[in-house]
């Protein structure tokens, strides 16, 4: 997992609520046995149906932040949705709320999800309509900086530490293997 500390990027405005995992990556693209290759299918059906869909706009092709509406990532528990987003270059999603399962999948795969109040997210989304608009996300400080305005966000301390250090669950366990072995031995008596 790639470490994340701070990012300055333009943002993709996607003010839709209840974006489910099937919208993010349709089920017919889930035929691979590896994690690779899902980014090209991100929002496939929406891109095909609507040529003006924001992910068809080349002005946002280098954006690493997505701003969305309520309940992002709802639907099935498919981890492929997170893989598709990260492989398409998304490193941060800002929304008023996220599905719990999606939130956990994102944290385990290095995708930072930030919950801010709905009015603030809508304001940021409106500003992001200008492709030249940018913001800075600082995980260490837990802030989003927009034109000098600073918005603080909460984030689980354990997940924050793992993301800052680039540790997935397995790497974290391996890093603490000696402590785990000591504990297991102490339990045997």
UniProtKB/Swiss-Prot annotation:
InterPro entries: 3-IsopropMal_deHydase_ssu (IPR004431), Aconitase/3IPM_dehydase_swvl (IPR015928), AconitaseA/IPMdHydase_ssu_swvl (IPR000573), IPMI_Swivel (IPR033940), LeuD (IPR050075). The keyword Repeat does not apply. It comes from the Bacteria. It catalyses: (2R,3S)-3-isopropylmalate = (2S)-2-isopropylmalate. Pathway: Amino-acid biosynthesis; L-leucine biosynthesis; L-leucine from 3-methyl-2-oxobutanoate: step 2/4. Its EC number is 4.2.1.33. Pfam families: Aconitase_C. Keywords: Amino-acid biosynthesis, Branched-chain amino acid biosynthesis, Leucine biosynthesis, Lyase. One of its GO terms (molecular function) is 3-isopropylmalate dehydratase activity. SUPFAM superfamilies: LeuD/IlvD-like. One of its GO terms (biological process) is L-leucine biosynthetic process. GO terms for cellular component: 3-isopropylmalate dehydratase complex. NCBIfam families: leuD, PRK01641.1. Belongs to the LeuD family. LeuD type 1 subfamily. Catalyzes the isomerization between 2-isopropylmalate and 3-isopropylmalate, via the formation of 2-isopropylmaleate. Heterodimer of LeuC and LeuD. This is 3-isopropylmalate dehydratase small subunit. It comes from Francisella philomiragia subsp. philomiragia (strain ATCC 25017 / CCUG 19701 / FSC 153 / O#319-036).
């Amino acid at each position: 997992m790639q470490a994340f500390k701070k990012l300055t990027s333009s943002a993709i405005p996607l003010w839709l609520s209840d974006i489910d995992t099937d919208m993010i990556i349709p089920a017919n693209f889930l035929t691979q046995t590896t994690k690779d290759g899902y980014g090209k299918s991100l929002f496939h059906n929406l891109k095909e149906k609507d040529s003006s869909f924001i992910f068809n706009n080349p002005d946002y092709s280098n954006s690493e932040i997505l701003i969305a509406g309520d309940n992002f990532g709802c639907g099935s528990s498919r981890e492929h949705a997170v893989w598709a987003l990260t492989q398409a270059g998304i490193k941060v999603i800002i929304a008023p709320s996220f599905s719990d399962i999606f939130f956990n999948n994102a944290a385990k795969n290095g995708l930072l999800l930030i919950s801010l109040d709905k009015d603030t997210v809508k304001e940021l989304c409106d500003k992001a309509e200008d492709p030249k608009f940018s913001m800075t996300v600082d995980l260490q400080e837990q802030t989003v900086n927009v034109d000098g305005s600073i918005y603080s966000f909460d984030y689980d301390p354990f997940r924050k530490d793992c993301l800052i250090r680039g540790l997935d669950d397995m790497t974290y366990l391996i890093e603490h293997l000696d402590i785990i072995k000591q504990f297991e031995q102490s339990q045997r008596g």
